[in-house]
């Protein structure tokens, strides 16, 4: 099978798995049991990896919390800030095209009496397609806003948000700015020493690390704003009482290794992946009349280089997937693809429900090859033609 669903997950880099193995088999000490050498060894390894992670994000190591993944990180960031006992503000602002791990959290807050504003994004035919409407954002944020939460890059259409502008709008009213950076970390430059974001969420499995481990940064932006969190998990006091539970050295080491590789190899990988996306798109355009792109222009400043989202004339994406089973791709977010509803991201772009159902997403990754892309084009075009006669 040709795997073109790297926004859902990425394969674990063999070099990452190699670094994990000793900590799964040989060095199994509890990093919080430091009365003996095995525990101290595990703690030291975690501390080293936290330093690596923090350095690549432009923050201090003590500003990184280890979680089970970005879903937990988003919950901890949003709920933790809004439900802290000293939080007096009762307003949250987000975008209409966030991941469900953000939208569902703010919906729960709304049910509990918080005021939630969901800002639309520019439509598919706009020059800034997929980017949040900054004028509407500025009008919505007020002195009661506790948090603005907007993703760094979108998991379906790959749009990169104007982070500096969002940060400025959030901070001038005294709100904190959280970003679900799951699709950005390891793919593009995420430098919190340069971009004034207070908290970000990420998952290792999106940048060729293992599943089940992620992070939440709480540095408070360039200004070092105070971030008060009410913990979700209690019962051990680990990670400064903000996230209880025994940390897994193998997972933390793997995430540090994966991020190190992703950052150091980013320029080379981006060139290859961008070329393969162009190869795939050009092949599909030549083979399928009327195929149309969804989302922003294929420019690095606006869109993740490996992302391609397009819609078909005449058939639904699910049917195309079934007819092209040699290629792994998707019709939307893997975290919510069991939902019968069309993608809220695509309808948020202004597409009709029919257009959204006729859309698919490809995610090209560093382990793909041009030969795979050529074969994928053959399979995809043949699959489409088998459905349309």
Regions found by a protein language model. Name each.
Residues 1-389:
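Pyridoxal 5′-phosphate
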């Amino acid at each position: 099978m040709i795997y073109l669903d790297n926004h859902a997950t990425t394969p674990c880099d063999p070099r990452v798995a190699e670094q994990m193995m000793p900590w799964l088999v040989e060095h199994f000490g509890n990093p919080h049991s430091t009365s003996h050498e095995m525990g101290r060894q595990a703690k030291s390894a975690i501390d080293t990896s936290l330093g690596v992670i923090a350095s690549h994000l432009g923050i201090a190591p003590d500003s990184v919390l280890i979680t089970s993944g970005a879903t937990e990180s988003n919950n901890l960031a949003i709920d933790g800030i809004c439900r802290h006992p000293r939080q007096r503000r009762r307003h949250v602002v987000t975008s209409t095209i966030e991941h469900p791990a953000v939208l569902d959290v703010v919906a729960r807050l709304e049910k509990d009496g918080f005021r939630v504003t969901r800002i639309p994004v520019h439509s598919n035919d706009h020059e800034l397609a997929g980017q949040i409407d900054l004028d509407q954002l500025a009008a919505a944020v007020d002195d009661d806003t506790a948090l603005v939460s907007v993703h760094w890059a979108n998991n379906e259409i790959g749009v990169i948000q104007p982070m500096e502008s969002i940060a400025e709008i959030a901070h001038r009213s005294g709100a904190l700015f959280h970003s679900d950076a799951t699709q950005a970390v390891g793919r593009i430059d995420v430098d919190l020493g340069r971009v004034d974001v207070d908290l970000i969420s990420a998952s290792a499995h999106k940048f060729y690390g293992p599943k089940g481990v992620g992070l939440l940064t709480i540095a408070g932006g360039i200004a070092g704003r105070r971030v008060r969190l009410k913990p979700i998990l209690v019962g051990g006091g680990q990670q400064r009482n903000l996230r209880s539970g025994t940390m897994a050295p193998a997972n933390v080491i793997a995430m540090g290794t994966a991020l190190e590789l992703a950052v150091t190899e980013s320029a080379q990988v981006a060139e290859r992946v961008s070329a393969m996306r162009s190869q795939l798109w050009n092949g599909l355009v030549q083979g399928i009349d009327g195929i149309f792109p969804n989302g922003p222009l294929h420019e690095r400043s606006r869109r993740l280089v490996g992302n391609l989202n397009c819609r078909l004339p005449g058939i639904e994406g699910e049917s195309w997937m079934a007819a092209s089973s040699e290629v792994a791709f998707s019709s939307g977010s893997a975290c919510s693809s069991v939902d019968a509803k069309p993608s809220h991201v695509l309808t948020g772009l202004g597409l009709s429900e029919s257009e959204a159902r006729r859309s698919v997403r490809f995610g090209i990754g560093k382990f793909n090859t041009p030969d795979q892309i050529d074969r994928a084009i053959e399979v995809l075009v043949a699959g489409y033609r088998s459905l349309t006669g």
